[in-house]
Amino acid sequence: MSYTNGNGNGNGHKPKPKNVLGTELKCCCLKPLTGFYRDGFCRTGADDTGRHTVCVRVTDDFLKFSRAVGNDLSTPRPEFAFPGLVDGDKWCLCVLRWKEANEHGVAPQVVLESCHESALKIVELEDLKENALEED
């Protein structure tokens, strides 16, 4: 039996997911409930084709940019358990969307401890660090 929820390694063990800093992945947000698996964590698996691995705090500028490039994150979509985001919400964002926003100067700040390590296959740690959110 293999796991498909992003936590398994196929042999029955469930290793704790790691973040981009190499430590245990921390929860991104429970309100709104985020993550591909809607468990608050930016973890991923084979069924997460968008790779929702970057924990961000969205801004109005980012939300406008995302809508302009065809990904409306502001409008609620209850059929996908998606509440619609507003400025200040934390959310597990697709790594390619974050990279695109960064290239256009509108990347939202990230919570490094809550970004899944697999994001580093697409973006550089230094780029994430340059946009790191200082938590209170």
Q: What residue spans do the PLM features occupy?
A:
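Glycine- and charge-enriched low-complexity intrinsically disordered segments
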Residues: 116-136
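Short, basic/aromatic beta-hairpin or loop at an interaction surface
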Residues: 57-72
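Short alpha-helix capping/helix-loop boundary micro-motifs
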Residues: 74-81
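Exposed, flexible binding/inhibitory loops of compact, secreted disulfide-stabilized domains
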Residues: 57-59, 100, 126-127
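Extended boundary segments
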Residues: 2-61, 132-134
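Short, compositionally biased
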Residues: 98-121
